[in-house]
A protein has these predicted regions:
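Flexible, glycine-rich linker and terminal segments associated
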Residues: 2-17, 66, 70-252
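Conserved, compact domain cores that house catalytic/ligand-binding motifs in diverse enzymes
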Residues: 12-81
């Protein structure tokens, strides 16, 4: 989940990184990422960013506003250009709205109520890599059209961790499938050791589109435990993360 994007007045953050995008099938294009945020008066933040690979590029521009007791909002637009072959280049835009609010009386946070709408030609970096490397798998869903997500976090006190609940719904271009996700979890820490336990349930409603495509529902439950352990000595602030999960699948 993401918070509405804000910076204090006069503060500027710049982040630049270079690395490889690691696809599960071994596709590893070099990627450059950069972003900048600056806080202005009256609770306004302007921000922008970019991603670039050999055949992919995107640029984003957005604005955030502190609403005081009402919370905070931000809105941004991303333009992307994705090349798949000499005569197949897609361009499109994505529009995102974020809202966050903290309720001090109950120590509850509404971390995100966001809506993202993408035009048909818009591809994220991961979607571009997936289509280039595994087109048959990619076209089982295609690129994402819209997503709505909300996360509610309840603090149990300084020493007792947090409970959280996330709900989301998303749809894709070129299919009428609807994916829904519910995740409930608990996270806590002790000194530099942290852990998270979660249960998630996802459901995909597939709509039939002709004689060879039957409507069905596929659901999946995932139980996960993750543990983050600090590495002492010369490793400085490095951490080792361990996780274990169990999947239960069903279809109808």
């Amino acid at each position: 989940a993401s918070l509405a994007i804000l910076k204090r007045e006069g503060q500027t953050d710049v982040d630049v990184s270079v690395g490889e995008l690691r696809d599960e099938d071994g596709f590893t294009p070099d990627v450059l990422q950069a972003q900048i945020l600056h806080g202005f008066s009256h609770g306004i933040t302007l921000y922008g960013g970019m991603q670039a690979a050999e055949n992919y590029g995107s640029a984003a521009l957005g604005v955030g506003k502190d609403l005081g007791a009402l919370g905070a909002i931000s809105f941004d637009v991303t333009h992307a250009r994705a090349n798949f072959s000499h005569d197949d280049t897609e361009t499109g835009q994505s529009y995102r709205f974020l809202y966050s609010k903290r309720f001090d009386d109950t120590d509850t946070s509404l971390r995100l109520v966001g809506y993202r709408y993408s035009t048909e030609g818009y591809y994220t970096l991961n979607e571009w890599a997936s289509r280039r490397n595994s087109p048959e798998d990619f076209w089982e869903t295609g690129n994402r059209r819209s997503r709505v997500e909300g996360t509610l976090t309840q603090s149990l006190g300084r020493d007792y961790g947090n409970l959280y609940l996330t709900l989301s719904r998303q749809q894709y271009w070129h299919t009428d499938d609807v994916e829904r996700l519910m995740q409930f979890g608990y996270s806590s820490s002790w000194k530099r050791l942290s852990w998270n336990v979660s249960w998630s349930y996802s459901n995909t409603a597939r709509q039939g589109t002709g004689n060879n495509h039957a409507s069905d529902n596929t659901s999946e439950q995932i139980y996960m435990l993750s543990l983050s352990v600090p590495l002492s000595g010369w490793w400085g602030n490095s951490y080792a993360t361990y996780s274990v999960s169990q999947n239960d699948n069903s279809g109808s």
